[in-house]
Amino acid sequence: MPTISRQEYVGLFGPTTGDKIRLGDTNLFIEIEKDLRGYGDESVYGGGKSLRDGMGADNRMTSENILDLVITSVTILDARQGVIKADVGIKGGRIVGIGKSGNPNMMNGVTPGMVVGVSTDAISGEHLILTAAGIDTHIHFISPQQVEHALSNGVTTFFGGGVGPTDGTNGTTVTAGPWHIHRMLRAFESLPVNVGILGKGHAAVAMPLVEQIKAGVAGLKVHEDWGATNSALRNALRVADEMDIQVAVHTDSLNEGGYVEDTIDAFEGRTIHTFHTEGAGGGHAPDIIKVASQMNVLPSSTNPTLPYGINSQAELFDMIMVCHNLNPKVPADVAFSESRVRPETIAAENVLHDMGVLSMFSSDSQAMGRVGENWLRVMQTAHAMKAARGKLPEDAAHNDNFRVLRYVAKITINPAIAQGISHVLGSVEVGKMADLVLWEPRFFGVKPKLVIKGGMINWAVMGDPNASLPTPQPTFYRPMFGALGKTLQETCVTFVSQAAMELGVKESLGLERQVMAVHNCRAISKKDMVRNAETPTIEVDAETFAVRVNGEYATVKPVRTVALNQRYFFS
């Protein structure tokens, strides 16, 4: 059999097993662990290439038995799959195959269900990286334009609350009451992302919560600005257990209703998603970070403090004053803001992410966080932690696969598991909805090349539409056909409770998007957090705020420069 050099092969078909890829300008290198295609029978689109009539494309089969879309020879980076090279087959908006595509009449080893034919389109993935699209579980629905910025950084799913720029929405991720819930469910009909709405979890009895769950929320939020009391937490968790939804909490910074130990007691061992697990964004001062040691706690933190930089402390004060309706002329308000910003716990937050103790990243959009920077901050933090802490014990000698996959999990599969949507989204696996992001390695984590939503490209870097090619300047992100008309509704999902599904919320509100129920939100724990399931003992010194993890001081110095930064942006 004829052979070619590895360098020639990479030029033609992209990297294969054993090849390494640098991610942007970071210090992170991934190595392809296995290749599921067949050497010499690769599916390649283009003039003179193999995916032609009667060659790699079957010219007899009808659409029923062939792919709608094939992504050829792409490097898959997925928290569950690892780092693999494969073709990815999409049909009906879902992933139906990962392996070898083509024409089984002419090619050996074609994976069942991955036949290419007359009804198949192709994306050339030879020199690209494919990930599951990002999931942001901490969105303040302040402005609909957040969607554009999120898509431009590879995020296709929003979980959060709010109704626009009210003071309540600016401070809390809560859509309060059936009237607001129904208006927001209808508003999202025209926005090209998946969505799940969080209702207000503050009640002394069940019915005010139950009516929101039946109205169509996918979870509840308990927030200190509305009173994160132990009674509210217990009641919300009790109702959530009965109706299989998730509860998110932003705890009591002022410790008015109790301390962190009291809040842990109020959880009563039940599953809960803790926002701001470090505390700069809010929560028991100074030691909310201790909840990350609990098996029933699914901990996330937000991107303003990740990675920990020399300006992190300074910018957080003003963020808090604006978001939480505080007055800089009132000493008590100033003290409240200052109590939340602790460099020692911010440094520890970064370390705990690197150790796999904090399981998820989110943005806290326009309410102390940046919705268009989740993938960016994930990769910047991974780079900064490798620079500060060296290789992880789990990493191989010559690649950073484990560390990179740990961080990818924080923005893909783990948020999906926490919010009860991992049966639909969160990973590059057969059967999942085809919400996928294609990246050029040099732009990984910064600027995706294509965002695929439900099997259709809905967001992409595109040049001048009046040019003779797609590439001439100015190139910037533009909505594609998948984000328009009825196709938007066919490729996007609104997540609601099972109770709302059974009551026919889709029909009663006239929703045209796909509507699906969240499930398995309660019978999960920290051990289900992929590559981020550690539960060490965490202690915080009440005087110095120093954090110790299993007795060892957990800290890093603030970074002065970060990867994936000004080299990639004009400002």
UniProtKB/Swiss-Prot annotation:
Its cofactor is Ni cation. It comes from the Bacteria. GO terms for cellular component: cytoplasm. Transmembrane segments: none annotated. Coiled coil: none annotated. SUPFAM superfamilies: Composite domain of metallo-dependent hydrolases, Metallo-dependent hydrolases. The active site is at H324. It holds the Pfam family Urease_alpha. GO terms for molecular function: nickel cation binding; urease activity. GO terms for biological process: urea catabolic process. It is an enzyme of class 3 (hydrolase). Ni(2+) 2 binds at K221, H250, H276. The keyword Coiled coil does not apply. Residues 133-571 form the Urease domain. Pathway: Nitrogen metabolism; urea degradation; CO(2) and NH(3) from urea (urease route): step 1/1. It is found in: Cytoplasm. Substrate binds at H223. Keywords: Cytoplasm, Hydrolase, Metal-binding, Nickel. Its EC number is 3.5.1.5. Its main location: cytoplasm. The modification N6-carboxylysine is found at K221. Ni(2+) 1 binds at H138, H140, K221, D364. Heterotrimer of UreA (gamma), UreB (beta) and UreC (alpha) subunits. Three heterotrimers associate to form the active enzyme. Belongs to the metallo-dependent hydrolases superfamily. Urease alpha subunit family. NCBIfam families: PRK13207.1, PRK13309.1, urease_alph. This is Urease subunit alpha.
